[in-house]
Amino acid sequence: MTRLENMYKKEVVPALIKRFGYSNPMAVPRLVKITLNMGVGEAATNKKVLENAVADMAKVSGQKPIVTKSRISVASFKIRNGWPIGCKTTLRRSKMYEFLDRLINISLPCVRDFRGIPPRSFDGRGNFNMGVKEQVVFPEIDFDAVDAIRGMDIAITTTANSDAEAKALLDAFNFPFRN
């Protein structure tokens, strides 16, 4: 069991029961999954770029990502239906908690001019979305071996019914929200 899983069971659940008055510990919001997505627009012209993006995401997530393909042809983007244009992976259970621990304690403090994450990134249903502008903030990525700086989207899915519950859950994990 990872550090954040222990923290969730021993500290977060009792704190959220006390704050929101849940009658059952199973009613307390929990993390379901973390989805990482990296869109690589230049993959339409250069296949090597997508291979490097997949390798970077595999290092960051600890599992092999799937290659996403375009659903429709768009002439202005110069892509056709079925062409590979990005990669994504879904983290669950212990890998999810390990990634969140590294994100909170190692990667986000490495971001230049980091003053916290704005709390307006909730979707109204208890899920949180954020973006990272460069993949080199993760310690698994070697800065010298990177061919291009790429960002990625991080979607944290919870069982919370409201944004307030989800924010309280992430606050309990010491998520660095902006004041």
UniProtKB/Swiss-Prot annotation:
Gene Ontology molecular function, alphabetical: rRNA binding; structural constituent of ribosome; tRNA binding
GO biological process: translation
InterPro entries assigned to the protein according to its UniProt record, in alphabetical order: Ribosomal_uL5 (IPR002132), Ribosomal_uL5_bac-type (IPR020930), Ribosomal_uL5_C (IPR031309), Ribosomal_uL5_CS (IPR020929), Ribosomal_uL5_dom_sf (IPR022803), Ribosomal_uL5_N (IPR031310)
Cellular component terms (Gene Ontology): ribonucleoprotein complex; ribosome
Subunit structure of this chain's protein: Part of the 50S ribosomal subunit; part of the 5S rRNA/L5/L18/L25 subcomplex. Contacts the 5S rRNA and the P site tRNA. Forms a bridge to the 30S subunit in the 70S ribosome.
Family matches, as NCBIfam families: PRK00010.1
Stated name of the protein: Large ribosomal subunit protein uL5
Organism: Xylella fastidiosa (strain M12)
